[in-house]
Amino acid sequence: MKNIFLFIIIGTYTSLVNASDIYRASPERYVGKSDIVETNVGTKYMAVTSDPQATEAAYNVLSNGGTAADAAIAAQFVLGLTEPQSSGLGGGAFVIYYNAKQNLLTTFDGRETAPLASTPNYFLNNNKNPLGFYEAVLDGRSVGVPGTPAVLGKLHERFGKTDMQKLIEPAVALAMDGFAPSRGLLESLQNDIGRLDKNKKNKEYFYNQKIIKNKNYADVLKAFANKGHNTFYKFPISTNIINAVNKKNGVLTQKDFD
């Protein structure tokens, strides 16, 4: 049995909201539990994610001799595509990596960081009252500097051995060929009608495709594999993020990405 266990949490976060809004709305809907209960036992390795395609990507990496870190990275690249409501390269991540053979626990903190230009009043309106939940979360001010790309890159440098080109292959194939939205994604999209679909590009991408394709995501992953995770924090990727965020009241600059 491989004596390595890896636990990875990837997510995106928002900051200050009204207390009443916290109970009224949440970033992601509960989609229920399945009545099917199965027990599976792994004698050599096991991969578990919330998406079968991500699980398959991780499993195949392990089957070909990859490490738990390699498997987690491959899975996260897929999840960033198929579950954008939950995680992605634009968010933050925490990783806990345990090597049982060495009894060694290693943690990685890849939480997003606030822009240098943010202030204590960042999420207050002109009347000095906290912004409402959706007012804040749909605003550029809710976007920090992504930590996930750096965490995945550093995790691979420390504990990976499979070539990054191999790790991006499942996600790139799905992005180019397309994938059917999961129940969780569809319910999130349904819940956000009237908000998310107000943006033309969001509407075209999420609501006008039964099979979702994302060539831009594939291109970013290829750049990640070819040039390393730091390419995410440089032109043109960083510039595209900054421009998009700052059109919606954000204050990101290249200094935040350096």
Report residues per predicted region.
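Cleavable N-terminal signal peptides
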Residues: 6-7, 17
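N-terminal signal peptide c-region/cleavage motif recognized by signal peptidases
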Residues: 12-14
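Extended rod-forming repeat segments used as scaffolds/tethers
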Residues: 9-10, 77
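Positively charged n-region of N-terminal signal peptides that target proteins for export
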Residues: 1-4
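Noncatalytic scaffold domains of N-terminal-nucleophile
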Residues: 20-56, 60, 68-227, 232-234, ...
